[in-house]
Each structure stands twice: as C-alpha cells, then as structure tokens.
Amino acid sequence: MLIIIQSLLLATTASLCIADTPVPTQIRLVHDLLDNYDKKAKPMWDNSKPINVSFSMDLYQILELNEPQQYILLNAWIIERWFDEFLYWNPDDYENITELRLPYDSIWLPDTTLYNSLVMKDDDTRRLLNSKLTTDTHRRAALIELLYPTIYKFSCLLDLRFFPFDVQVCTMTFSSWTYDQKGIDYFPYSDKIGTSNYLENEGWYILQTKIKRQEVKYACCPNNYTLLQLTLYLRRKPLFYLVNLIIPTSIITLIAIVGFFTTSSASGMREEKVSLGITTLLSMSILMLMVSDQMPTTSTFIPLIGWFILAMIIVISLGTVVSSVIIAIQKRGSLGERMSKRALKFAKVLAWFTCTSLPPHVEKEHMMEAFDAPTPLVEVRPLQLASVKESVRNKWVSGARRATQRGNSGLALISDKSTDPLIHLSPTAHQPDESISPSAPPVPSSSPLPPPLTPGPADDVVSVASELSSKFLTSRMRPKSQKDNTFAAMQSSIKANRQLAVAEFEWFATVVERTCFVIFVVAFLIITFGINFIGFIHWHQAGVEYGG
C-alpha cells in the first residue's frame, strides 16, 4: 500500500514539473499555425479573390540543346511568392518572430506547371524542400517564398535553316493547371530571367532573356488562364562546325578540282581522274551523313550547311563528268583525224583566255594567216590518194590493152573527165605535157605499146588521155626500189598526219582542261564564300537585334 502511494506522489510531481517547463516560442507558433490549418483549401478569407503568385527564374546552366529531337534541357532555380492569409501571426505574441521555415508538404502550394514539359512526373522535374514564411502585419498575411532547384526538359521548335549560323528562340510556358485566373493569377517578379549565376555553355551564347505575362482563353473553360512565357534567345557558336565540317569540305572540294583539271600525269592519260572523283564523292557523302545525323527529320527546309555540302557534291560530280569528256577529247587524236577549222578557231580563243601556248604547227599556220600567206587549197589525204591511184591504174591498164589489140587504127584512149579524179586534182589537166609532142617519133608496130597519138587543136580529151597514158606507161617501167620509196613516203605521211592529230587534240584537251579549271575554281569560291557569308550576316544581325 505504501508503494502505491509513493508511485502516485512521484507521478503527480513529474506532471507538475512538465507543466511548469516552458515550451519554445517557435514550436508554440508552429502548433498555433497548423492546428486549424488545412493545406487543401485556398488560403484566402474571401474565396472569390485570386491568389497573386509572383514567379522568377535564375538560370544556372543549359545542359543540352538537341537538334534532332528539338528539345532543351536546362538547370534553373525557381522562386514562387504569394500571401497566405491563414498563416498570419502577430510577432508581438511570439517574441517578435517574423520568419519561419516549414516543410513544403505542410502548407498550401500553387500547382505551377510547365506546359511544354517533356517530363510528366513532377518529382523528376523539381525538388521541393522547405518554404519560408514572413509575417506581414499590414496585409495581415504571411508571405510564402518557395525556392527549389529544377531540371526542365521542354520542347522547342528549332529553326535550323541557317545552321550552323542559326539563332534559336525557345519559350517556356508556366501557369496553373487547375486554377484559372480567378483562382491563381501569375505575375513576373522581373521582366528577365536571372543569369548572374549562369555557367557559360560551350555551344551557345545567351543573347537575351524575357518574361512576358499573357492571358489566354481556352475553349474548355469559361475563364481566362494567366500564362507566364519565359523566352531564351540563343545564338550558336559556329567554330566547331567551321573547323570540322565546312573547312574540310572546302579543302576536299578544292583538291578534287585541282586534281580534275591539272595537266595529265606521267602516263600521259587522265583516266585516274575519274577514280579521284568517285573517291571524293564517297567522302562527301560521309560528311553529309554527319550533318544529317544532327538535323531533325523534316522536309520543310534544308539547312544552310546542307546546301553547302550539296553544292560541293554537284561541283565534284560535274568535274568528274567534264574529266570524262576531256579524256574522250584526248583519245580522239589517236584516230588520226585532224581538227576542223571551226574547232581550231574556237580552241585558239580558249587558249588566249587561259594563256595556253599553241602547238608549233598550229602557231606556224596562225602566223601564215596573220601575214596573208598562201596556203594549200586542196588537201588530199594519203588514203584517198592511194585509192585514186589504184582506180586510175586499173582503168589505164585495160585501156592500154585495148589500144594494143587495135594497133595503129588511130583510135584514141579517151578518159571521161567527169569520172577521173586526177583530172580535177591536177592544175594542168587541160595543157599538153611536154613529153608528148607532134615531133615525137612513132612507135614501131612490133612494140607491145601503141604509138602516141598526135593531139589535134580541137580535141583536148584525146590530148589528156594521151598524156595520162604516157605517164602511166612511164610509171610501169619504174624500178621496184622507186615504188618502195613511194610507199614509204605515203606511210610516213600518214604517220605524220596522225602525230599532228594527236598533238592537236592533246593541246585542245589541255585548253579545255584549263578553261574548266578557271570556271570551277570561280564557282567554288562563289559557293563557299557566298553561302557562308549569308549565314554570317544572319548570325551577326541576330546579335545586333537582340543586344548580343
């Protein structure tokens, strides 16, 4: 019994001691604020009034700007501010405490949402910690400041027409998802995004930032929604693409042009230039694949660097085709046909344009034309001359045989001037030869050849026939060595004519080659500097416009 009485006395004494222990003021303040507080209710005594939420962002780092998928990943710090009328306290009652920290999940929070976010789970986007409460005796409300770090991944429609000299404008849209303007009204705390703690990105400049408030009426809802649009103006740093894409492409194209249109190699032919063109096209296609991997899959536009590489591919393709034509021109000389006068005249103009010297025989003919020197009017090719001689030989052999059979009947060997080629080619076809004269002695009847006929003054045909017959008979009696010399001379003439043709077409191929070299180099310079100059002008003007 005594033990029970002692236990009761100890319990009573302990309770009295606990009751007399003072409770900390801030604990008492928290208990007083949260005892009757419901975080599910909008903290306004007048429910018809909206809660004004102030929003600000301090950009910390741009982590990624993805061109193919067209999104931006960035790290930022967000501060939201609003007044909570249910959490007001009088500092005089709590030892002049004006600030308090409470967990975020113990108070009412606005459901601020990034409308164009690509991440739907809020926990993956922001990390909420504690909120700061500051009592305001004038408004009889507590100012709530919610500061939290975020990693936002949001969509941005990129304009890559001037890539890599492009400027991007990306906008983040914030608002409440459940409250319209009568529930929550958003206001920007500043008209710009803070960049005081920003870490510079290796690929992008920030030209300008802007925050704009906008009221939007949606078809689903009767009241307007207040949106905050935070805009980033970004300009790309093009040095990486200049060094790794544009300059290598330009060098490859220039080397290909030089390889296409330089003089032939030690082998004397140009077939290896086609292989050079095919190899260069393969390397350009690899560069094109590198660019396409960084571009979005779209058919609405072609980026500037795409036009550049495509133009270089066209230049190399045309160079390969022209090299094939030049090879065909060079091989044309092996056929032995000389260039026509019209083609030679055109080649002389191109040679003057490209400062190419003329071949010796062409230069000699050119000088003769300049001084009005006479040139041969008729040019008989060796093959044609041989065929003509063979035809004449056959005709006059048969005629001589007929004349021998007739004896001295006085019939003349008549040649048709309309069918005899040598009559047209000889400048003295209508004049009697000195070897045939009226005073020539007659040929005896025992001779196998008929005596020469005496040409009458009225019969030129008989005179010409007698002349040709005499020449033919004389040639029949020439020794064999003299015939061999004639054949060797004809072969030498054909060989010389072929050598002249080879020299002419080789020279013409060189002239065309140098002309195309000048044209392709000019086209290359215009394309290279023109396209990049257009991109640089756009890049520079964007910096001036947005204050970069």
UniProtKB/Swiss-Prot annotation:
It is a multi-pass membrane protein. GO terms for molecular function: excitatory extracellular ligand-gated monoatomic ion channel activity; transmembrane signaling receptor activity; transmitter-gated monoatomic ion channel activity involved in regulation of postsynaptic membrane potential. Pfam families: Neur_chan_LBD, Neur_chan_memb. Residues 422-460 are annotated as: Disordered. Glycans are attached at residues 52, 96, 224. It is found in: Cell membrane. Residues 439-455 have a biased composition (Pro residues). The chain crosses the membrane at residues 240-260, 274-294, 301-321, 517-537. Residues 1-19 form the signal peptide. One of its GO terms (cellular component) is transmembrane transporter complex. Residues 538-548 are cytoplasmic. The keyword Ion transport applies. Keywords: Cell membrane, Glycoprotein, Ion channel, Ion transport, Ligand-gated ion channel, Membrane, Receptor, Signal, Transmembrane, Transmembrane helix, Transport. GO terms for biological process: chemical synaptic transmission; monoatomic ion transmembrane transport; regulation of membrane potential. Residues 21-239 are extracellular. Disulfide bonds: none annotated. Subunit of the non-synaptic neuronal acetylcholine receptor (AChR), which may play a role in chemotaxis towards choline. After binding choline or acetylcholine, the AChR responds by an extensive change in conformation that affects all subunits and leads to opening of an ion-conducting channel across the plasma membrane. The functional receptor is a heteromer of deg-3 and des-2. Interacts with ric-3; which is required for proper receptor folding. PANTHER family: NEUROTRANSMITTER GATED ION CHANNEL. Belongs to the ligand-gated ion channel (TC 1.A.9) family. Acetylcholine receptor (TC 1.A.9.1) subfamily. This is Acetylcholine receptor subunit alpha-type des-2.
